[in-house]
């Protein structure tokens, strides 16, 4: 059972997004991008009040994922990536992205000593 409704097309979109955003980070990095994407669909706060589907999350502009602007995102979906996407759509969570709405690529920017930690989520309800 999935934690959000999705179509086959949306599962493929999420799989392509996960690959385009984090293939160089390996399977775990891709799964965490998937967590961020699913969390954005579930969240009803901040920049994500109008995001109600995988498709609207993937193509959100402004404030969405940059990889949709590049040709690599538009390559055909691979079965391995689709299987990873289905895992997060079914509710698998991967720390520290289990409740994250954004992620940070430390390889491209100066890395903060800690970029996650205790946060109050009183305004945000996500399934556990």
Map each language-model feature to its residues.
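Conserved small/polar residues in nucleotide/adenosyl-binding loops
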Residues: 122-128
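Terminal helix-to-tail segments of small alpha-helical proteins
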Residues: 9, 46-115, 124
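Generic helix-packing signal
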Residues: 38-41, 89, 126
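Short, surface-exposed, charged loop/turn segments at secondary-structure junctions
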Residues: 32-35, 116-121
